[in-house]
Structure formats: structure tokens, C-alpha cells
Amino acid sequence: DGTWWGASDWSKDGKKILIQNYISITNAKAYILDIQSKKKEIILGSDNTESYNAVLAFDQSDKGIFYITNEFAEFNQLAYKNLITNKIKVLTDTIPWDVDGFVISMDGEKAAFTVNENGFSTLYLLDTMSKKYRKVDRVPIGLIGGMEFSEDGGRLGLTINNFQSPSDSYVLDLKTNPLLFGDLTRWTYSEVGGLNVSEFVEPRLITYKSFDDRPIPAFIYAKECLEPQPVIISIRGGPE
């Protein structure tokens, strides 16, 4: 049909699959596919109004789902839908940034998600039962990806890309309480061609006004120097 279809998660009993239907960057739906009957039921999105809905995972009881949506705000928010009552709870309604990553532990008791704050990733831990979350405050500034829980849920693996590292692996020690964590340990040191990373320039986040007085965020990579230097402005993305 010209759109993209893919599987997001299996139910714990192995009888159902969460199916993602991506139509465009502003329109995505989700379904539950019953393996035995081969029938699918729409659970997120509508034919009448467009909204982005990225289905992520079943909860530990298979009675609800976690997903990312822009239906209720100008940001992509993390939300939870109870499949029995059809009630929806936006979990990150106090975070004015896009949620762009999510992972859940094998037992479904813990989850982690990332938020894009002006170009940098912020990591949060989520208690899937209480729906409370906590910011992890000991992660180096950069872009976070590749998140995965260990089988026992005691560790969270992730990659961090920043101004001194193209992408390196880190492991965050976790406690029994889903919101408690221990040390963050770096596991790899990527090849940078023999360059001295201490001389790499750390970007500085600034904002400047556009022609219509909108604040535009930008990163400046500039070494200390006495004379004015030429500047290259690289613009990523645009209206969609």
C-alpha cells in the first residue's frame, strides 16, 4: 500500500504482536495482530486525523502498551495506553522536549528513555508500574543510542557519541528499585586516527534570533583566538 509495516514487540504469552504502520513523519498508526486468527486491530492513530504514534512495547502484564506520540502536544511524548479501559496517560507531560529513544527490560519492570534537549540526549529511568521516572545525572554530554538491558535487568548498556568520541559503549549499573542506579562505566575507546582528543573543541550551545524573532539554537565549535575567524553554518533538516 506504499507505507511501511513492521513488528515492534511480542506479547509475553506469544499470542499477539504489536505492529507499526509508518505512513509519513506526521502520520503513523499501530495495530495488535492476533497470531491465531491473523486479524489486526488498530490501537493507535485514526483515519480521520493525522498524528505520529510509534508503538514501543507491551507492559509486563500485556494489558497496556508504551508508545511515543505527538497527539497531545507539539513534542513527541512518552505515553501509556491501558488496553482494557483504552485510557491514555501521557508520562512526560512536564518535559518540553522530544522523547526519541526507549527500551524496556525483559521482565517488563524497568524501562529507560532518552529526550533530545536542544541537540543533547538526556537519559531517564522509568518504573513501569508506578509510571514514575528519574533523570540519570552522570552521563557525559552527547547523543545516546543503542540502549539495551542485560537479561537480569541489572545493567543498562548504551552508546554515547560526543565531541571526543565517535561512538563508545557504556554500562550503567542498576539497582532492584527501577529508579535507582549506580556507576556508569565506559567499556570502549574508539579509534580517532591517533589524534589527541584533549585538543578537540567542545561545542557551545547558543541561540540567535531569526528574521521573525524566533530563537534558533546552534552549536559553536570555536577555539580561543585573538583574531576573527571565518564561519561555516551547517543547517540540518527543515520544515516537514
Give the residues covered by each predicted segment.
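Peripheral, non-catalytic segments that deliver or gate enzyme domains
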Residues: 1-227, 238-240
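Hydrophobic beta-strand anchors of alpha/beta hydrolase catalytic cores
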Residues: 230-234
